[in-house]
Amino acid sequence: MNLKERTMKLSDNTLNVLKNFAGINNSILVKEGNKLRTISVAKNILAEADIPEEFPRDVAIYDLNQFLNGLGLHSDPDLDFSPESYIAIKEGTRRVKYFYADPQVITAPPEKEINLPTEDVCFQLDSTALDKLLKAAAVYQLPDLSAIGEAGVVKLVVRDKRNDTSNEYAVVVGETDKNFVFNFKVENIKIIPGAYDAVSYTHLTLPTIYSV
C-alpha cells in the first residue's frame, strides 16, 4: 500500500458516527476496512455502521472524545496512517502525533458477526417520534422505553414499568397481529437521530437500518 492510500479525511457522516459511538464506549478498536463497530463496557449495547472511508489499518483509540476534540482544532485535516505507532494529523503547517493505544485495554466487539434469528416484529421509527419520546422521558423522568404490541397496533411508550401510576408518553408506530412487550432502559438508547426500521426478536430488540 503506497503513502497516498494510507492518508484519508473523515467525512461529517463518519465523525457523527464516531461521536455517537463515544457515548457507548469512549474507547474504540477500528478494524481495517469500512465498518465501524463498538460495544459498551457492560457489553449490553452493540453498534455498527458502514462508512464511506476505508481505514488502511487497525486503529486502537483509548479516549475517543479526546481524539475527536483534537480533530476539531483543525478545519479539514488529513490523517496519515503510515507511521507504525501513531496517526499523523496534518493541515497546512500544523502537525499532530496521536499515538495508538494497546488494543488489549479496549473493550471491543467480538470478531464473529452476530447471526440474528428470524424477525418477529418490524416497525418504522421516524426521527420526530424518537426525539419526542426521548424528550418526554427527560421531562417526566421516565427510565423505560417499551415497544408494546396490542389491539392491532405497535406503540412505543416511555414509562416507569415498575410503577403502575407513573406518567406515560406513547406514540403508535405501526400495526401488528401479535401481542408483545419489549423493554429498554432509556439510558441505553444510543442512536444517531434519523429514521430507522426497528426489528424485534424473541430475545432481543434493536434498530437495524439507519436512513440518512
Segments (PLM) and residue ranges:
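DNA replication sliding-clamp ring fold and its partner-interaction surfaces
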Residues: M1-L46, D50-I89, P110-R159, N167-Y201
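C-terminal interaction segments
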Residues: S85-P109, S211
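Extended substrate/cofactor- or partner-recognition/assembly subdomains adjacent to catalytic sites
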Residues: N163
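Single conserved hydrophobic/aromatic residue that forms the stacking wall/gate
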Residues: H203-V212
